[in-house]
Amino acid sequence: FGVTCLFAFSPDSKQVAFVRLDETNVPSFEWQTFLNDEGMMMYPQTHSLRYPKAGEANATASVCVYDIYYKTIKTMQIPEHMNGYVPRIVWTPIPAPTKADAQPMSDLVVLHINRDQNKMDVLKGNPKSTVCRPFYSEQSNKYFVNYELFDQWQWLADGRVVVVSEKGGYQQAYMYSVQGVEQRLLTPGECDVTQVYGVDEKAQVLYYQVANTPMIRQAYALNMKKNTTTCLTQGEGTHTLYFSKDWKRYVDC
């Protein structure tokens, strides 16, 4: 799934979320080796690896949170029917304090994919209570679900999310509320959003790249307040932008 590790520190660095695999019920596969770098070995070596062949039990994945101060581990309450893959875990930004919640916490977001890889579910979990609730779901009856688009999602400080999906036939960006309700399509048109650079939350501007044709990719800025779009690049070819942290400057490569 394009990852070499599955752990993530919370924005305040007080907790670490990680995926744990339990291979207790996975049968062991054994084999022998007779050669090493020096040639034939006098005594062969036996190796063992837990490997689930077709029809055998797979390793079960669980999402856990380690509290660095209290040195405790909590297991998030993922629904039992979700026994597939967990290729991504991320933390949401820390919300602004309110009168009702003076010390708000980040949520833990869990991406789950079924074994057929044609259905993806996104859960938002409370690391304190370990309760997870459904936030987003997408399923295809013909193709696999492009879970890699999850890496393009933008989690805003006010709880909203810019979701990138192919559900409408084209790869487009949508705005979702903090409850996981679709609010509107941000990038209408018969073309694909190939990259989301990010959101200037202060100015409420979304920066992204669009494949107008297979040979041309331009960069755009969408003012989400005024619902106006500005093309930032000119000329043919592929334009890839690299922005400064304050979103005031960029390099066009």
Segments the model singles out, each with a brief description of its role:
Residues 15-21, 26-29, 56-62, 73-76, ...:
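Non-catalytic accessory segments flanking enzyme active sites
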Residues 172-173, 185, 228:
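Leucine-enriched alpha-helical scaffold segments used for protein-protein interaction
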Residues 67-71, 126-128, 177-181, 223-227:
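Short loop/turn segments that connect beta-strands within beta-propeller blades
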Residues 5-9, 17-23, 53-57, 92-93, ...:
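Beta-strand C-termini and the immediately following turn/loop, strongest in propeller blades
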Residues 1-8, 15-69, 73-75:
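Predominantly five- to eight-bladed beta-propeller fold
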Residues 78-80, 112-114, 126, 136-139, ...:
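Active-site proximal loops enriched in glycine and acidic residues that flank catalytic Cys/His/Asp
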